[in-house]
Structure formats: structure tokens, C-alpha cells
Amino acid sequence: MTTPLDGLPRGIGRPATGALAAAGYTRLDQLAGVPERDLAQLHGVGPKALRILREALAERGLSFG
């Protein structure tokens, strides 16, 4: 899966995309260094979305905090 740094992966779903945008995260690179547990607390961000985001970050040598 290739995701540009200027967006979020489509596979995370609409609820997760909306929750992340409401929290101010609209780009993949903004998630680097953010604690995964903080993102998991957002309503709409579940295990599947976190896995997809983790994989997309790892493809770029980045990770959650």
C-alpha cells in the first residue's frame, strides 16, 4: 500500500479519517511520534485503522511515539 505523506491511507475507513481530521491529523507524517494509545482513544479509530497506519508509517521508516 502506497500512501503519500500529504494524506491518510484510504483503507483506514471514513470514521477513522474523520476522527483523525477532527483531532488535527490530516497527513500521515503528522502521526509520526504520536503515542498509539492517544490515537486509539479517538472515537472511530480502531485496531484495523491503527494497523494500517502503523504499516504505512513503517513503509517510510516512521513510527508512532
How should each PLM-predicted stretch be described?
Residues 1-65:
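Compact, charge-rich alpha-helical regulatory domains located at protein termini
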